Curated annotation (Swiss-Prot):
Homodimer. The tRNA molecule binds across the dimer. Its main location: cytoplasm. The gene is serS. It catalyses: tRNA(Ser) + L-serine + ATP = L-seryl-tRNA(Ser) + AMP + diphosphate + H(+); tRNA(Sec) + L-serine + ATP = L-seryl-tRNA(Sec) + AMP + diphosphate + H(+). Consists of two distinct domains, a catalytic core and a N-terminal extension that is involved in tRNA binding. One of its GO terms (molecular function) is serine-tRNA ligase activity. GO terms for cellular component: cytoplasm. The lineage of its organism: Bacteria, Pseudomonadati, Pseudomonadota, Betaproteobacteria, Burkholderiales. This is Serine--tRNA ligase. PANTHER family: SERINE--TRNA LIGASE, SERYL-TRNA SYNTHETASE. Belongs to the class-II aminoacyl-tRNA synthetase family. Type-1 seryl-tRNA synthetase subfamily.
Amino acid sequence: MIDPQLLRKDIAAVAARLATRKFQLDVEKFNALESERKSLQTRTEELQAKRNQLSKAIGMKKGKGEGAAAEMAEVTQVNADMESGSSRLAVLQAEISDFLMGIPNLPDESVPASKDETENKEVKRWGEQPIFDFEVKDHVDLGGPLGLDFEVAAKISGSRFIVLKGPIARLHRALAQFMIDTHATEHQYQEVYAPYMVNAASMRGTGQLPKFEEDLFKVPRQMGGEDGNGEAKTENFYLIPTAEVPVTNLVRDEIVNTDNLPMKFVAHTPCFRSEAGSYGRDVRGMIRQHQFDKVELVQITKPEDSMQALEDLTGHAERILELLELPYRKVLLCTGDMGFGSTKTYDLEVWVPSQNAYREISSCSSMGDFQARRMQARFKVGQGKPELVHTLNGSGLAVGRALVALLENKQQVDGSIAIPKALQPYLGGLEVLKPI
């Protein structure tokens, strides 16, 4: 959530910055809400002053032994007016909060202002695209003999699911373990095991709710008892779309000692996405799934450190690609292509030979204080006033897409897969993964 004071001070400037994100700020609505809020607060202050005056007058009259029925009746009316105003103010504050919840983050000044992904800026390219002297297979054809099974997954769950067996399941597990170990030992992240289901407050904290509810898998749970309509009380849980949600929420409603910053976490979890709006896209293979594994990096920093932390975090994800000997490029997203909560984002795109294209394998973002304001995640220096932390996150990496890239870039003429040296210790020293 952006700072409401920015809107109150210069709403035109905020609207202009948001327009670069293809977001039209409803200036008229916000001004109307603010005008009523100010009027109500002024009226409440006036009523409070009047009640204080009446209370003094009542005290003086009673001290003189005089009656104060009229003043007491007036106090009763003032109290009723204050209660009515307080109720309306609470409703109004909720409306303002809902309004703010729907506004995306402001882009950092270093982000190029452009309309869509076609104008993202490539800032780095690493590795040589492999040249094959045989017909290149895609990961579906390569994976089948290694234990990749879409048919049985469709029988069990439906489309956009996979079953991995034998060699390919082992390779998938090895990739995740290699990523976690590298981040924990080389990059000093603390490993976290977190819930795969979270409550609505956690989803609101990181920005998935209320805007992106249709992209989530919701799990209602009966709580016992009935609501006001006689229906059974329920509470919604949500399957996590990324470990960013539970891990970032570790600091929700917390005041962190500045000596503990930065906080660096790594977590390996399954991720669950409905892929609403993705009908017809990447229908073949593992690129777009309802369930997939990801190793996620999260950092909690002081405001002045967050931009350098983004460079560092992105570099940590790049390190995995380089150790896996996978060609990739680093792209700075323009304002029109950034995620809802991001103030600056780098995408890492890995080379996929069968598609003759680079495909996203990691997205690394600084959220500034956007999530922290929603979560009330703060830090304090000594006895000073608490300030909002900055939060960052990035994939380090998406395990399934790393598997896709490894299969295709390291394929051999006989369908076997050459294992990068850094990954071999996680496969018992295996240098080549052969079909079953």
